[in-house]
């Protein structure tokens, strides 16, 4: 589990591309590699990956084909930065919202507006069926960052980025057309899906 509060960014130093998976070598800042163990979960751009090997500040994680297809990890290159969050432990503060690290799809940045104290990003889902889970002032996880939906117009929604988040995450490297990972809030998805199922069952019973 994660909270969407990014601990820092890391750099991809090597990518081994195999037929059914990629193997990433990532260099972590020293504060993020402290007490890290084999088998630990760590969020890469919002994707929960398992630490397979550790060598000082370098870690290796495998990314399977399904994850490569549904996230932006498959288009990353050596030298790219990624958002990193260590998994939460019992008693840790939850500064954002509960995030599983199971990215559902990507969204494309359609517009970025920057000012001295704010950055507004408009996003367009690549899987439009996920838009039914987007609500005004609802939670959304973008590249591992816990954010709030600030507006919705047709098939696009926007989020606001505060200066701290802009400077200390990969958001500062984004531009129009960039792909970001999206995880819908679990509780929102559960409510929407349950309500839909109940309505459909009730409608079906009326005509049976």
Curated annotation (Swiss-Prot):
Main enzyme class: transferase
Q: Where does this protein hold 2,4-dihydroxypteridine 2?
A: 48-50, 62-67, 101-103, 137
The answer to keyword Repeat applying to this record is yes
Please give the superkingdom of this protein's source. Bacteria
Q: Does the keyword Transferase apply?
A: yes
* Pfam families with a match to the protein in the record: Lum_binding (PF00677)
**Keywords of this protein's UniProt record, alphabetized?**
Repeat, Riboflavin biosynthesis, Transferase
Q: List the disulfide bonds.
A: none
Which parts of the chain are Lumazine-binding repeats?
1-97, 98-195
Q: Which reaction does it catalyse?
A: 2 6,7-dimethyl-8-(1-D-ribityl)lumazine + H(+) = 5-amino-6-(D-ribitylamino)uracil + riboflavin
Q: EC number(s) of the enzyme? A: 2.5.1.9
Which annotated residues bind 2,4-dihydroxypteridine 1? 4-6, 146-148, 160-165
Please name the GO terms of the biological process aspect recorded for this protein, alphabetically.
riboflavin biosynthetic process
Q: Which GO terms describe its molecular function?
A: riboflavin synthase activity
- Provide the Gene Ontology terms for cellular component: cytosol
Q: Which InterPro entries match?
A: ATP_synth_asu-like_sf (IPR023366), Lumazine-bd (IPR001783), Lumazine-bd_dom (IPR026017), Riboflavin_synthase-like_b-brl (IPR017938)
What pathway is this protein a component of? Cofactor biosynthesis; riboflavin biosynthesis; riboflavin from 2-hydroxy-3-oxobutyl phosphate and 5-amino-6-(D-ribitylamino)uracil: step 2/2
The UniProt entry, under PANTHER family, shows: RIBOFLAVIN SYNTHASE (PTHR21098:SF0), RIBOFLAVIN SYNTHASE ALPHA CHAIN (PTHR21098)
What NCBIfam families does this protein's entry cite? PRK09289.1, PRK13020.1, ribE
Assembly and binders: Homotrimer.
Q: What does this protein do?
A: Catalyzes the dismutation of two molecules of 6,7-dimethyl-8-ribityllumazine, resulting in the formation of riboflavin and 5-amino-6-(D-ribitylamino)uracil.
Q: What is the designated name of this protein?
A: Riboflavin synthase
């Amino acid at each position: 589990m994660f909270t969407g509060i990014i601990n820092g960014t890391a750099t991809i130093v090597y990518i081994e591309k195999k037929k059914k998976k990629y193997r990433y070598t990532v260099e972590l800042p020293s504060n993020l590699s402290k007490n890290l163990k084999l088998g630990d979960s760590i969020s890469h751009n919002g994707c929960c990956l398992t630490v397979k090997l550790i060598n000082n500040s370098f870690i290796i994680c495998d990314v399977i084909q399904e994850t490569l297809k549904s996230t932006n990890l498959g288009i990353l290159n050596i030298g790219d930065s990624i958002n990193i969050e260590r998994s939460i432990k019992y008693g840790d503060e939850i500064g954002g919202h509960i995030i599983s690290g199971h990215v559902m799809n990507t969204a494309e940045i359609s517009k970025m507006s920057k000012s001295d104290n704010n950055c507004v990003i408009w996003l367009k889902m690549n899987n439009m069926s996920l838009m039914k889970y987007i609500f005004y002032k609802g939670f959304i996880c973008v590249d591992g960052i816990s954010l709030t939906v600030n507006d919705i117009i047709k098939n696009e929604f926007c989020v606001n980025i505060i200066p701290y988040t802009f400077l200390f995450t990969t958001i500062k490297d984004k531009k129009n057309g960039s792909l970001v990972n999206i995880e819908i809030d679990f509780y929102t998805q559960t409510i929407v899906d349950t309500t839909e199922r109940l309505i459909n069952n009730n409608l079906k019973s009326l005509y049976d």
